[in-house]
Amino acid sequence: MRKDAKKESMPEGKESKYKNYPIDFSKMPCAYWSDSAKISYLQRRIIVWSIMYYEHDESCVPDITYDEVSKQLVELQKSVSKQEWEKSTYYYAMFDFNGSTGFDIPARLLKKDRVYLTGLANVIHSQWKKDQAKL
């Protein structure tokens, strides 16, 4: 970087907002995502992990990670307006998610979302199994 070039950074006060969470939204490219995009991202992770756990009987993430990301999602949902939260991709399936369990979420998905997220979960699970075999 040139000496005179300015380093791109978050507006003051925004960085600390995400510092103690497992997913750091203060870093690029997600630093400028809308709150509904951040919620959608966390929802997608929770749903994929739930599919893996409840349908493959295995998880690629420890329970503590699932719990921390769930807590981050719940707190982010509480911190935004209802209108912003309702813009999230999977609001219709996770409107009452409180972080305690995700067993019923996959069954609530629209067929197209269910197919997409199950496919994603299958690919992630398959790669995780290959990685585990190398250990």
Question: Where is each model-derived feature located?
Answer:
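Phosphate/adenylate-binding "loop-and-lid" substructures adjacent to NTP/NAD/dNTP-binding pockets
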Residues: R2-L135
